[in-house]
Amino acid sequence: MKIIDCTLRDGANVVGNGFSAELTELMLRGLTKNHYPIIEFGNAKGIGADKKGFPAPLTDEEYLQLAQPFLDRAEIGMFLNAKRYEPENVELAAQYGLAFLRCGSDAGDAHLYTDQIRDIKDHGIKAYF
């Protein structure tokens, strides 16, 4: 069994749409040091959400830069709200070496997002759903 830790993403809803650089780095360091295998982080509303009216303390690119030292210690990725999908967000995730994007949709709507999942996989990124 593998456990995904989404504290850095979903937990950020408690403080707004994301954690500060200091807290993000502190938690990435702690989670990887304690061998959490899969870590989801970034804007609580998902990659690209800052451009859709959901600003976080950091931009997606700033979160991605912050994660670079930890990419070889765990599968690190971000949430992608399927309704806010934009191809450039998948490109950005691939450019920064994310291991996965977790594509979220409303219950029963998964069939509407096969193109988004295909795009994620075509960029060499795991697509969690």
Residue spans of the language-model regions?
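N-terminal glycine-rich anion-binding loops that anchor highly charged ligand groups
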Residues: 1-6, 28-47
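N-terminal small/glycine-rich loop or linker at the start of catalytic domains
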Residues: 1-16, 68-73, 126-128
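Conserved, mostly hydrophobic/aromatic
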Residues: 11, 31, 101
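Glycine-rich anion/phosphate-binding loops
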Residues: 17-26, 105-112
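Short, acidic/polar
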Residues: 20-30, 83-93
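Glycine-rich, proline-tolerant flexible connector loops at the mouths of alpha/beta enzymes
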Residues: 37-63, 102-111
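Alpha-helix-loop-beta-strand connector modules within alpha/beta enzyme cores
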Residues: 49-78, 117-129
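Catalytic beta/alpha-barrel core
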Residues: 78-82, 99-110, 128-129
